[in-house]
């Protein structure tokens, strides 16, 4: 995802600078862009690099895996704001990202989101694949949105699977791919009796979420997971969801006979 955003910026004549986390980014792909490597705990080094590159606008992109405290090597810039960093780490993922973002904003930077810098990567409203949801799927979508709305304040997950009005799985730390794999296993074990081709994956940002950070994302792998789970399609919030490689995703959905629905916010 960081590289797709960087490509989008480059195509519009904006030269991005990547600050890549060691152990999290693909070195070969990072090499395509102007970049610097930083480690978790090097907030001071990162801040100096941002200023040396003349970067005022910053965006967090990608999955942030929480390291064990023993793996973090703090520099002086991090130690200086250790209380605020620790407070951010104690919360959920949304709290962590927004907490670090607030620290950077207090240092004079501006945190932006994909909606600000690469709106072309967001899901449009309406159905974008050939297949369309039937009345049962529409009801499942409504149920999924209701469930996610209720769960949002608890920072549990951004996705739920609903089949014939029944909530069969909610996303947790495993992520959406793991959620879909779990549904596939439940179906294989006979725990899901509904026939294949019914049910919906619904994704939405949490109600308490800062939309500059960690927007829900769908792509080809999501479509493959939905097909493997025996569902009918996916529904996400238009303008609040990243559609990674949207054309390839649509083609994959059409091959599998799945719908992709962008819901009004």
List each language-model region with its residue ranges.
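General beta-strand structural signal in soluble alpha/beta enzymes
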Residues: 18-19, 58-61, 111-116, 161-162, ...
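Gly/Ser/Thr-rich loops at beta-strand to alpha-helix junctions
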Residues: 1, 64-67, 241
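N-terminal glycine-rich phosphate/adenylate-binding segment common to multiple enzyme folds
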Residues: 43-118
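Catalytic domains of riboflavin
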Residues: 2-4, 24-25, 100-112, 116-128, ...
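N-terminal basic/disordered segments at the start of proteins
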Residues: 1-21
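Conserved mixed alpha/beta catalytic, RNA-binding, or beta-rich assembly cores of soluble enzyme
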Residues: 1-2, 9, 94, 110, ...
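Feature captures the catalytic cores and cofactor-binding loops of soluble hydro-lyases/lyases
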Residues: 21-47, 52-55, 73-81, 85, ...
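Short amphipathic alpha-helical segments and helix-helix/interface helices
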Residues: 3-10, 47, 100-101, 223, ...
């Amino acid at each position: 995802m960081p590289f797709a955003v960087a490509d989008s910026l480059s195509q519009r004549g904006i030269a991005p600078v990547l600050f890549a986390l060691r152990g999290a980014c693909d070195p070969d792909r990072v090499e395509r862009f102007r970049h610097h490597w930083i480690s978790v705990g090097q907030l001071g080094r990162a801040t100096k690099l941002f200023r040396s590159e003349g970067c005022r606008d910053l965006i967090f992109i990608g999955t942030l895996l929480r390291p064990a405290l023993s793996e973090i090597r703090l520099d002086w810039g991090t130690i200086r704001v250790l209380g605020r960093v620790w407070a951010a780490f104690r919360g959920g993922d949304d709290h962590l990202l927004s907490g670090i973002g607030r620290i950077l904003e207090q240092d004079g930077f501006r945190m932006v989101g994909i909606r600000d810098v690469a709106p072309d990567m967001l899901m449009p409203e309406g159905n974008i694949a050939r297949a369309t949801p039937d009345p049962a799927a529409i009801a499942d979508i409504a149920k999924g949105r209701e469930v996610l709305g209720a769960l949002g304040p608890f920072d549990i997950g951004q996705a739920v699977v609903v089949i014939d009005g029944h909530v069969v799985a909610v996303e947790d730390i495993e992520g959406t791919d793991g959620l879909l794999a779990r549904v596939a296993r439940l179906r294989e074990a006979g725990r899901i009796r509904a026939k294949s081709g019914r049910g919906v994956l619904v994704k939405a940002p949490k109600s308490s979420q800062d939309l500059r950070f960690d927007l829900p994302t769908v792509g080809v792998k999501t479509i493959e997971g939905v097909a493997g789970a025996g569902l009918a399609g996916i529904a996400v919030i238009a303008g609040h969801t990243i559609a990674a490689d949207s054309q390839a995703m649509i083609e994959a959905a059409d091959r599998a006979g799945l719908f992709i629905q962008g819901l009004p916010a």
